[in-house]
């Protein structure tokens, strides 16, 4: 009845796993008890779980990212500590099979459940506001996409205490991920977590792509769009093209494991290297899916806090488009050692070097924007400056790895690990932190505490260099990835320095938690009354903070690239107050079907992992029926009256006048 699921699936003999899992259960029970005690379930259901408001969904993506960041960071600390202990001549506290699970989970969590939610959360908040829209094109899909990501994160977490996770590395290369060498459920957990999350991300890509193409404010041509919107457009083009490749690749691996097909086996016509090509055809665009939106963040931040128009806007746009195209023809640099031949390696090495050119163009544009600007050293600018240094180092080492002979020496070493952490942490994570500090008041109506924000930055940047620069040297010394036992003692000192760096990053995370708590506590002293705390340039700053449900009482008409900045000259606000005629606004209704479909998806994924056929069929049918019911629903909107809008907007204008703005 329960397929392969038995009580033996619970790892009673692993004290670290059991203690961790019990702690997770206790924390979940405490949260549920607190919500019950304060009678907040109804509030959460109607205001959050069922919401289709892009701003609230953005907040929920951020919560998911920070919860999973804690899990991923703990995994990183465990791995680094194990390596330090093992390099000192001891066995350590993590057996190889447990270390390999942590190693795999760390990569999956940080890419799919930290970086992606942070990036998608920022796009959710900013895109509709920047283009003058009231919401995204498909509000229900937005809700569904989020909850699919949550269900896949829960499925991954279940593997910690029920069964095991994959021991293959985060990309699960065959034949190791095949049924012959990984006969347990670990790879199946990996497959279905990524599959459900990937479907949600694909729906997000379609949603944002249509939103940008079809819902821009009147007059906002492509070359009047803010750079963040441009980078988001290119990102979602990449999502729509590349994520179906991941979906198909996972389907083929599933057929190999479940039905004894031979797509990626070493016999009967299979080809394991086809999998490696397919996974990286998705995997390298994924790097730019993560990094392009934060390029947009930095573009907005440097222009705002330098009090200047962005230098080289057109070149930035073309550089973004160039990266979008080139990102599909560089994937083979991840496996020069495969043996494709000198000509193939040379081609992909050259394309990899070429893609560094538009990235370099962007960096110079940001530097020239800052040059001779009246720079306000806000924490967002600090994260940007930190990015410029760390990402440049990561980019240079990436160009070095694009040379096939050098890659043959450095492939699979810690040099490579240092490189991609330079890019992902120094680029994506720093960029998301800059964006959070920058756009936070637009969500919550008050600014974040700058003192603790800057402390967090300095601990992060110092910890980052201590944690990852030693890895370059370890890679050059010959230390490979995935080592957990019998590590050469000559690596011990540098591993200790890297571990100290990880502790500094941990302190940085604690500073960020303190920053949020202090900001909430002192919010009455840091209110953003005008909706424009940074003297911004783009449309999101033309509405109140927090932005109202409808975003804009009147859809703006755009005449210039920095239209809001230009309009603020003279008597802009007074003109608006005297000229607005309000009308009823139709907004999308909340729906609980997205949440329900995610529950059914969780049951489907769990039953597929454990071969519980009846539950798998029932949950799949429930998903189809739920989607069918949603398609029949015609009562999808409600009306906000003109009187209510007028009341909200007049309060905003009073705040504007109190601030002395004209």
Curated annotation (Swiss-Prot):
Heme b binds at residues 106, 170, 421, 481-482. Cu(2+) binds at residues 284, 333-334. There is a cross-link at residues 284-288 (1'-histidyl-3'-tyrosine (His-Tyr)). Its cofactor is Cu(2+); heme b; Fe(II)-heme o. Its EC number is 7.1.1.3. Residues 36-58, 128-145, 211-232, 299-309, 368-380, 435-456, 515-586, 630-662 are cytoplasmic. Residues 1-14, 80-106, 167-189, 254-277, 331-346, 402-413, 478-493, 608 are extracellular. Binds 1 copper B ion per subunit. InterPro entries: Cyt_c_oxase-like_su1_dom, Cyt_c_oxase-like_su1_sf, Cyt_C_Oxase_1, Cyt_c_Oxase_su1_BS, Cyt_c_ubiqinol_oxidase_su1. The chain crosses the membrane at residues 15-35, 59-79, 107-127, 146-166, 190-210, 233-253, 278-298, 310-330, 347-367, 381-401, 414-434, 457-477, 494-514, 587-607, 609-629. GO terms for cellular component: plasma membrane. It catalyses: 2 a ubiquinol + O2 + n H(+)(in) = 2 a ubiquinone + 2 H2O + n H(+)(out). It is an enzyme of class 7 (translocase). GO terms for biological process: aerobic respiration; electron transport coupled proton transport; respiratory electron transport chain. Belongs to the heme-copper respiratory oxidase family. Cytochrome bo(3) ubiquinol oxidase is the terminal enzyme in the aerobic respiratory chain. Catalyzes the four-electron reduction of O2 to water, using a ubiquinol as a membrane soluble electron donor for molecular oxygen reduction. Has proton pump activity across the membrane in addition to electron transfer, pumping 2 protons/electron and generating a proton motive force. All the redox centers of this enzyme complex are located within the largest subunit, subunit I. Protons are probably pumped via D- and K- channels found in this subunit. NCBIfam families: CyoB. The cytochrome bo(3) ubiquinol oxidase complex is a heterooctamer of two A chains, two B chains, two C chains and two D chains. This is Cytochrome bo(3) ubiquinol oxidase subunit 1.
